[in-house]
Amino acid sequence: RQMCIRDRPFSVFDNPNIAFRQVYEAALNKIRDQATKERLLYGNWDFVEANDMAIYNSFDGSRHLVTGLKEKAYDPTKPLITVWDFNVAPQMSVLSAQIDYENRKVYILEEILGKPEEKENNTPALARKVRLKLYRDKHIGGVDVTGDPSGLQRSTTNEDGINNYTIITDTFGRGILRPKVKLLRKQPPQATRCEFVNEVFGGYEGWEIQIDIKCRKLTQDLIYQLRNEDGTKSKQKTTDPKTGVKYERYGHLSDCLDYLLCYYLRDSWYKFKSGGDGNGYVVSTSVIQEGFSY
């Protein structure tokens, strides 16, 4: 006869030594951090605190994270959007996405990280890494390159006319990838754009966001990024123990998500931002002023 055995988390209460159990339980009960207490006292390693101060409080892992999404949804014959964040610590970050406008679905397919230990936290190296990945995926649908508008600024180490986006498009080349840069003219106001992203997580105008479960850093941002009182992101810094470099632990991949939604769902973004019904708003000159491509 077959037995059905279910995995159950092991906790302090399973320890047969009663005296030890009582002392240990009393010590664990003094822990203030609820997440740590849940994990150590109850063996609940999947516990994620629903934090009222989390800025993306409409994100719901059970609803928005999908196992095997890239394998199910990615279409190499359709345009792929790559969204770039140019911070070098703790890593450089790229999100890849495709949007099904007909069914109002945003597919976040993959996060690609340029880590310092692999010397990939610079634009040329990460662009080469992404190019190789696109070749391996046999991508023929064209590639959009978007992200932080400040990436257009010329670095002091570069010549005139060279910036992060020209480096990416030059690396992708003039062949099969056909890169196009598409950017907002300036960064969308942080508090407003975070409210907008929350609304989209909640189904604003029928939109649905699906994120491949392998996007671990993005998921961490969505769970742990805290909100300042003015509605902006709390950009707390932490120090790398090896290098002594200070960096923002959370927010780089969620910034990519913000830029993606504000540019590619811009009808909804303008409507949300204006507080109106959006009718006729997007055909005004604000589109020309705020979004451009070259």
Task: Name each model feature, range by range.
Residues P9-N15:
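Conserved AAA+ ATPase "SRH/arginine-finger" region at the nucleotide-binding site
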Residues F13, Q22-L28, Q91, V283-Y294:
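Class I S-adenosyl-L-methionine
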Residues R1-I5:
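Short, small-residue-biased leader/transition segments that mark boundaries at the very start
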Residues P16-F86:
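ATPase catalytic-site recognition across NTP-hydrolyzing enzymes
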Residues M92-Q98:
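Short beta-strand scaffold segments in enzyme catalytic cores
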